[in-house]
């Protein structure tokens, strides 16, 4: 079977709480780093989440 093009990534909270979401992204169509506003349940606010690699 062929290797999939989608890469697993981690979206880490910029609030510094350590909270993160995991998702996948197509590295061929979106080579830049993802930045999304999502809800951080630790601070109970919508904050910016930035892409980081899953180790």
From Swiss-Prot:
The keyword Ribosomal protein applies. The keyword Ribonucleoprotein applies. One of its GO terms (cellular component) is cytosolic large ribosomal subunit. Disulfide bonds: none annotated. GO terms for molecular function: structural constituent of ribosome. One of its GO terms (biological process) is translation. Belongs to the bacterial ribosomal protein bL33 family. NCBIfam families: PRK00595.1 (NF001860), rpmG_bact (TIGR01023). This is Large ribosomal subunit protein bL33.
């Amino acid at each position: 079977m062929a290797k999939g093009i989608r890469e697993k990534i981690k979206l880490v909270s910029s609030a510094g709480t350590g909270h993160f979401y995991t998702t996948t992204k197509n590295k061929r169509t979106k080579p830049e780093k993802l930045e999304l506003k999502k809800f951080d349940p630790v601070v109970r606010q919508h904050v910016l989440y930035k892409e980081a690699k899953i180790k």
